[in-house]
Amino acid sequence: MVWYDYLAYIFAGFFLANGVPHFVQGISGKKFPSPFASPAGRGLSPPLVNALWGLANFFIGYTIIFKVGDFHFGMTRDVLMVGLGAFLAAVILSITFASRANPDS
């Protein structure tokens, strides 16, 4: 497999991890920041927008995993690349949103 397949799997993991908070907040009926809020990423979007945005992230991640390269759940390297993307999303997004929530930090 070529290197850009692994890069795509990292992006897939990022999309899958990013979809979780949007989807959960959406189906919980809570407002949550999204790219469609005003201002983008800072304002709060309605629950339906977040549920749909979460589903879109899941769809994008799923599509990348199964349409790019030759992904196999039995291949440790493939799964690790998706996990690395999810890990990077968790770290980057938690730092980003923590600094927005607490401007004094």
Mark where each language-model region is.
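Membrane-interface extramembranous regions
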Residues: 1-105
